[in-house]
């Protein structure tokens, strides 16, 4: 009946939906009712989130010691280390496609322009087992809920999604993600809630060559103002991180107060990144 109601205007029943959802969360799960309860909970949550967008948590962990992996393009690892603050540079370790670092103040790193993303390492990797129940238990026992609360302000559950990067085929991957998400919800007492569209954090599960899984946390609650000049973009626009990488590679050849011409400027992303790296007298762009 919920599937049918989801196609109608059900706003008059939101209170009843919330009460029923609370009852389901308190219901003891058994092998017999687990599948039905999880499906009903997911449908109710999706229906409520369409009408009532959750209030997102505010990231406050800029000075909370954390172990991070800064994702970069291959070959940009050392250049990324070179632009880090001197007080943390020695602690950074280059790895393929990124830089690993344990830092007292993560906020010092969020402004690095050649970084494509920031992953938090909150549990011991790789995990010992790969079954969804074992992985969920490892994630929960590593203190994910407390880890998130320590770095955020705000009440309510944390909505997450799972990015599974393994050798499983598509239909197996979909089932694994669904079961892993439901198990994390159950273990956390629904302080973690799986949502494919309204998530504020992401669990990236990757498989190595030995078939072992590693889990990292990506926080979408961190405000990224590095490329705030980018008001409009088109499909052919250069990605700003790519532009920052190009400028970093050419840094030693850039002159102060130069006249700079980009004959294929597009939306001028490369010109702007060039100016931010070293001041130019004039910028010219044609396309």
Question: What spans do the regions from the language model cover?
Answer:
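Structural detector for internal amphipathic alpha-helices that build alpha-solenoid repeat scaffolds
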Residues: 1-8, 39-43
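Alpha-helical repeat scaffolds
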Residues: 13-23
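Eukaryotic acidic, Ser/Thr-rich intrinsically disordered low-complexity regions
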Residues: 29-56
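Non-catalytic nucleic-acid substrate-recognition regions in nucleic-acid-modifying enzymes
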Residues: 49-196
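Short, surface-exposed recognition loops or helix-turn segments adjacent to catalytic cores
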Residues: 189-204, 260-264
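C-terminal edge-of-domain segments
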Residues: 202-221
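SAM-dependent Rossmann-like transferase core, predominantly class I methyltransferases
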Residues: 215-253
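Conserved S-adenosyl-L-methionine
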Residues: 238-287
């Amino acid at each position: 009946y919920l599937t049918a109601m989801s196609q109608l205007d059900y706003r008059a029943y939101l209170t009843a939906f919330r009460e029923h959802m609370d009852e389901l969360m308190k219901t003891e799960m058994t092998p017999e009712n687990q599948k039905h309860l999880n499906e009903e909970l997911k449908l109710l949550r999706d229906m409520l989130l369409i009408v009532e967008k959750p209030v997102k948590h505010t990231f406050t962990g800029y000075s909370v010691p954390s172990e991070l992996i800064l994702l970069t393009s291959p070959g940009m690892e050392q250049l990324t280390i070179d632009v880090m603050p001197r007080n943390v540079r020695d602690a950074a370790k280059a790895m393929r496609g990124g830089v690993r670092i344990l830092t007292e103040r993560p906020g010092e790193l969020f402004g690095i322009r050649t970084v494509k993303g920031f992953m938090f390492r909150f549990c011991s990797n790789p995990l010992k087992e790969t079954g969804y129940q074992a992985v969920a238990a490892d994630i929960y026992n590593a203190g994910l809920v407390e880890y998130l609360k320590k770095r955020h302000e705000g009440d309510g559950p944390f909505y997450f999604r799972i990015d599974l990067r393994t050798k499983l085929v598509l239909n197996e991957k979909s089932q694994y993600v669904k079961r892993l998400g439901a198990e994390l919800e159950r273990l956390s007492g629904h302080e973690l809630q799986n949502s494919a569209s309204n998530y504020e954090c992401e669990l990236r599960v990757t498989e190595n060559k030995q078939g072992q899984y590693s889990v990292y946390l990506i926080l979408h609650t961190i405000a990224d103002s590095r490329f705030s000049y980018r008001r409009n973009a088109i499909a052919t626009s250069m990605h700003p991180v790519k532009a920052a990488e190009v400028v970093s590679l050419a840094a030693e050849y850039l002159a102060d107060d130069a006249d700079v011409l980009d004959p294929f400027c597009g939306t001028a992303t490369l010109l702007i990144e060039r100016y931010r790296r070293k001041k130019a007298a004039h910028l010219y762009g044609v396309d």
